[in-house]
Amino acid sequence: MSSKRETLLKIQVNSMLDYLVNELKYPYYDSLEMVLSSATFHRLTENDLYLNQGTLYVLDDFKQEFANVQPHNGNLR
């Protein structure tokens, strides 16, 4: 059985993956790499208060971070 923290992290990651895969049509593997290398993901893993924010709030942060990335560069950091 997973902890509440793990469950919240899965929800947030799935929200970011859904945005990249279903809305922007990125391949799943590339999307997973982008999410896991993002500053938003690292903030989620390090800050419990941020992890408890709503998915729309976190997704908005991820979208802003993603918008600052050059189209040819898949790395969000």
Segments from the language model and where they lie:
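C-terminal alpha-helical interaction appendages
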Residues: 1-77
